[in-house]
Amino acid sequence: MANTAQARKRARQSVERNKHNSSLRSMLRTAIKRVRQSIAAGDKAAASEVFQKATSVIDRVADKNIIHKNKAARHKSRLAAAIKALA
């Protein structure tokens, strides 16, 4: 239990940040799933379009330090390779 005003405020901020970060992580996972689904469907044009949107989401989440920049690069690289393999 937070005893000081500062500790209570930090606890409140932590809860709000957790909600926000969870939302961003969920958005990231959804974007990646959409790309994987279009790859599984075999539609290269649609996959490329969805990948472009997912790249934006991945970069945004990495910029906010929700995931590490190397993890973001790894996601983008693997998705791009999978799209390229559709040819």
From Swiss-Prot:
Coiled coil, from the record: none
Keywords: Ribonucleoprotein, Ribosomal protein, RNA-binding, rRNA-binding
GO MF entries: small ribosomal subunit rRNA binding; structural constituent of ribosome
Span list, region Disordered: 1-24
InterPro entries in the cross-refs: Ribosomal_bS20, Ribosomal_bS20_sf
Source organism superkingdom: Bacteria
Example GO BP: translation
GO CC annotation terms, alphabetical: cytosol; small ribosomal subunit
Family of this protein: Belongs to the bacterial ribosomal protein bS20 family.
Function noted in UniProt: Binds directly to 16S ribosomal RNA.
Protein name as catalogued: Small ribosomal subunit protein bS20
Gene: rpsT
